[in-house]
Each structure stands twice: as structure tokens, then as C-alpha cells.
Amino acid sequence: MDNTNSLPFVYTVTSSLTNVVGATGSSTLIMQADSRFELMGIMATGGATAASEDNIQYPNFFSVSIRDQTTGRDLMSGPVPQRVLAGNAFRQFLEKRGIIFEPQSNLLFTFTNLQALTCNITLALHGYKMIL
């Protein structure tokens, strides 16, 4: 990564799931047109309330699968639980090498509820905009 042509940037994806185990929801994220995006880390929250996650070191309220609809590639072989993919704000998942997405890449996130709680999910993709 070239620091002269990159800016720290965060994309967010949100979804709400009903209080039924197995309930699903999806959200689409289209990357901005002015730059590539290098994904460096993922953080997430998804409990019924902030307090339901604050005291949990490795929360596990939902699973998610991510598909790059621009290329037709899945970013994982199946749904991945929150605690494996994202952890929480104190224990985020960091990529060893950045994953680069082209401008206007279209990502589909499919979420599944793992608890009998209403989940309001926010997934944050931390990385760098690489200005073209």
C-alpha cells in the first residue's frame, strides 16, 4: 500500500433480524467509484442491546456469508459465525494481507440469526481507499 495515495476508510453494512433462530436478512454494499478498497479488518455488533455484547468477549449472535457479485466469487465457503469472522470492537479480525476490491464492487451480505433475539447488525469493513 502506498501511503501517499491512500486514506483510512470504513464501509458499514446494516441488517435487522427478527427474534427467531434461523431468521435471515441480506444487505448489498456497492463500493465507491473513486478508488479501490483494501480490506484490512472486520468488526461487528449484532446483539439485542449493547449490554448483551459488552460483557461477552466473543459474541455469537449471527452468522454471515459474503459474495462478491461483481466477480461471482464467494468470500467464504459457507456462513461464518460472528465470533469467528469479526469478534467485537476489542478483538477485531485483521487480515494478514489486505483484500483489494475494485471500484464499484458489489458485495452481498447474507445474515442468519443464531439466537432467539432481535438482532440489529452493523458490520464494519476497515481498510484503505486507494485513490486512482
List PLM regions with ranges:
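Beta-strand-centric surfaces of beta-sandwich/beta-rich domains
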Residues: M1-L132
